[in-house]
Each structure stands twice: as C-alpha cells, then as structure tokens.
UniProtKB/Swiss-Prot annotation:
GO terms for biological process: regulation of DNA-templated transcription. Disulfide bonds: none annotated. InterPro entries: DNA_gyrase_inhibitor_YacG, Znf_NHR/GATA. It comes from Geotalea daltonii (strain DSM 22248 / JCM 15807 / FRC-32) (Geobacter daltonii). Zn(2+) binds at residues 9, 12, 27, 31. The keyword Electron transport does not apply. It holds the Pfam family YacG. SUPFAM superfamilies: Glucocorticoid receptor-like (DNA-binding domain) (SSF57716). This is DNA gyrase inhibitor YacG. Binds 1 zinc ion. The keyword Zinc-finger does not apply. Its cofactor is Zn(2+). Keywords: Metal-binding, Zinc.
C-alpha cells in the first residue's frame, strides 16, 4: 500500500490533492493569485543585508 502525504494550501490551509493539481502547492487559482499579490505588495520579504541606495553610492 502506498502512503500519501497530506498537503495543505499555504494561504487558506485547506487540504490539497497534490496529484493532477495545476495550482499546487495552492488549492486554487484564487489562493495562488492572493499569494502572488502579497509578494508584489512586499508583504513577504527574504531576509538579508539592506542594499545601499543609489544616493549613498555617490559619497
């Protein structure tokens, strides 16, 4: 018997079928687009050193 892992949508936490899901890891196109909008709005950020602005480079 093959075990299947449970997967959950990163946005709404609904259980998601992984196989044949064109939106994975999301449950739907809606959750996928909400997540993309959060990246575009800079609600999500990857930690790292702050990049100096162009004005600071002139010194």
């Amino acid at each position: 018997m093959k075990k299947t892992a449970k997967h959950f949508c990163p946005h709404c936490q609904k259980e998601v079928s992984w196989q044949d899901n064109p939106h994975r890891p999301f449950c739907s196109e809606r959750c996928k687009m909400i997540d993309l909008g959060s990246w575009f709005s800079e609600n999500y950020k990857i930690p790292g050193e702050k990049k100096p602005s162009e004005d600071e480079d002139d010194n």
